């Protein structure tokens, strides 16, 4: 449900790439980097403000990588030796503790979202939409994970995918259709 009034939320976004050993063409990556990620994340966090611990500002990292690197991370942290599309490493777990960062000028670090551009490109081709749309979709998914959302069963997955669709609509993107 959309909030009745939207408070401006300050967001610091660190946008990074690590495409060592990746087969991605640099032109596609450059196009992705020109997207207004900062504004999109800010808009999403403003909408999701009720899910955020209190802070004067927020910080997160968005890392674009390839299958090889994300497989290393997946093996190390999830014990699954295969590439995946998106990983989210939340800086805060579970119910957010009382945090004093609202009183400081330091941003509250939410965590890292890691996306395999190779996997996103493959999924986009399979699903018949653009790689850009797939990456935006995966970013929204990762952000929800940073804020404590999870999908251990079909019902929670359906709820989370619905929220992702709404996040894309908020930034003027048509959510992908899954058949």
Swiss-Prot record:
Compartment annotation: Cytoplasm
Regions that span the bilayer: none
A GO term for molecular function: zinc ion binding
EC numbers, comma separated: 3.1.-.-
UniProt: Zn(2+) binding residues: 141, 145, 151
Keywords: Cytoplasm, Endonuclease, Hydrolase, Metal-binding, Nuclease, Ribosome biogenesis, rRNA processing, Zinc
Record InterPro entries: MetalPrtase_cat_dom_sf_prd, YbeY, YbeY_CS
SUPFAM superfamilies: Metalloproteases ('zincins'), catalytic domain (SSF55486)
Gene Ontology biological process: rRNA processing
Free-text comment on the cofactor: Binds 1 zinc ion.
First-listed, main subcellular location of the protein, grouped into a coarse class: cytoplasm
Cofactor(s) recorded in Swiss-Prot or TrEMBL: Zn(2+)
Alphabetical list of HAMAP family matching this protein: Endoribonucl_YbeY
Job description of the protein: Single strand-specific metallo-endoribonuclease involved in late-stage 70S ribosome quality control and in maturation of the 3' terminus of the 16S rRNA.
Family matches, as PANTHER family: ENDORIBONUCLEASE YBEY, CHLOROPLASTIC (PTHR46986:SF1)
Protein name: Endoribonuclease YbeY
């Amino acid at each position: 449900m959309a909030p009745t009034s939207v408070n401006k939320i300050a967001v610091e976004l660190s946008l990074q790439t690590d495409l060592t050993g990746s087969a991605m063409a640099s032109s596609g990556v450059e196009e992705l980097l020109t997207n207004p990620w900062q504004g999109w994340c800010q808009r999403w966090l403003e909408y999701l403000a009720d899910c955020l611990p209190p802070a004067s500002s927020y910080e997160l990292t968005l890392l674009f990588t390839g299958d090889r690197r994300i497989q290393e991370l997946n093996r190390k942290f999830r014990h699954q030796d295969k590439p995946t599309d998106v990983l989210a490493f939340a800086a805060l777990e579970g119910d957010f503790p009382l945090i004093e960062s609202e009183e400081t000028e330091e941003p509250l670090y939410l965590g890292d979202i890691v996306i395999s551009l190779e996997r996103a490109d493959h999924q986009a081709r399979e699903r018949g939409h653009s790689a850009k749309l797939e990456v935006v979709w995966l970013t929204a998914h990762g952000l929800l994970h940073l804020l404590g959302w999870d999908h251990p069963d079909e019902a929670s997955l359906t709820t989370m995918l619905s929220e992702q669709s709404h996040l894309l609509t908020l930034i003027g993107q048509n959510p992908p259709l899954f058949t």
